A protein has these predicted regions:
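Active-site environment of non-heme Fe oxygenases that use a 2-His-1-carboxylate facial triad
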Residues: 93-136, 141-142, 146-317
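Active-site pocket scaffolds in enzymes
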Residues: 323
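Motif-centric detector for short Cys/His coordination patterns
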Residues: 1-119
């Protein structure tokens, strides 16, 4: 890949194609002291104030450093490498950690122990890598006093306050505004599907667990989605294309969002799942399409609730699950 100059034009040649770089693209990257703040790299001018009929009048190539002269009287120097790096960055997929599928046989997952100096340690790096691989990690020994979980959460990213506050105590209360405040057993689901955006990382922190039972159950939405895609492609297609309404209402707030049960990214790769049968409302569609949708929703519900995909264990005081 290289930069080529032909007459008063700049081209990028990637080996297969040779494309002219728009002169305005080059003009708005002017880096003179009166045009660009050297500290924060923010422009000191509005590029929309530049005449769009911009052209290059002269180009001098000084051993990989282009000295550009434009028809509006400005000129500056830019390295060929800067142009090449911008081109490469816009055509590369971001570095990702490969997802690992798991089911009920996944019972030897590593547990990480919280230490007071964990925040900038290799252990934290390993914890985050494991999180991205499997979608969850188990962390032990997290302090249970003074809402320490908030401090821990802020070490990963900014805590997002919701209508429930910075944190949510799962307990039974009278006149609850959410089923998590009741003793009702909850089947596998994703939390807060009615938010936009939905939670990125949630932290479940066990303060005490002295009851019989009280197990935590996890299901991998990625594994289930991929299985649906493999065995029932027509179900996968409709679950990833039909948006349903998720809704939460109490005395002070109404929260709604529309989303697919299997959400894909712009390249049609798996991004996330939303699943909360007590909160979702299908749209009005043709009967045949809804027939297929309801069959697909039942099938994915069967999978989420199947023992085949569940990992179940009991959290002890101080244990936490980022998920």
């Amino acid at each position: 890949m290289k930069i080529e100059i032909d007459s008063k034009k700049v081209f990028i040649n990637n080996g297969n194609n040779k494309e002219e770089i728009h002169p305005f693209w080059l003009r708005e990257r002017i880096n003179n002291e009166d045009a660009l703040d050297k500290g924060n790299q923010q422009r000191l001018f509005d590029p929309n104030s530049i005449n769009t009929n911009i052209d290059i009048e002269k180009i001098e190539n000084e051993d990989g450093l282009l000295n550009l002269f434009f028809n509006d009287g400005t000129n500056y120097k830019i390295k060929e490498d800067q142009i090449l790096n911008e081109y490469k960055s816009q055509n590369l997929d971001p570095i990702t950690i490969e997802k690992v599928k798991w089911d009920s046989n996944f019972n030897d997952f590593k547990k990480f122990k919280f230490e007071k100096d964990i925040f900038e340690s290799k252990a934290m790096h390993d914890l985050l890598v494991s999180f991205y691989k499997y979608g969850f990690v188990v962390l032990t020994n997290i302090p249970t006093k003074d809402n320490f979980i908030i401090k821990f959460a802020n070490s990963i990213g900014s805590v997002r306050r919701t209508n429930f506050g910075e944190f949510f105590n799962v307990r039974s209360v009278p006149n609850p505004n959410d089923l998590a405040y009741t003793s009702l057993a909850l089947s596998p689901h994703t939390d807060n599907p009615y938010r936009k955006p939905v939670p990125c990382v949630q932290l479940l922190h066990c303060i005490t667990n002295n009851v019989s039972g009280g197990n935590s159950t996890l299901v991998d939405g990625y594994t289930v989605s991929e299985k649906i895609k493999e065995d029932y492609p027509e179900y996968y297609e409709i679950l990833s294309s039909v948006k349903v309404k998720f809704k939460f209402i109490d005395k002070t707030v109404v929260l709604e969002d529309m989303s697919e049960l299997i959400k894909l990214d712009e390249k049609n790769n798996f991004k996330q799942v939303r699943f909360s049968p007590r909160l979702d409302y299908a749209p009005i569609l043709e009967k045949s399409k809804l027939d297929l949708f309801y069959k697909a929703r039942n099938k994915i519900s069967e999978a989420y609730n199947s023992d085949k995909y569940k990992v179940e264990f009991k959290l002890e005081s101080g244990d936490g699950i980022p998920n």
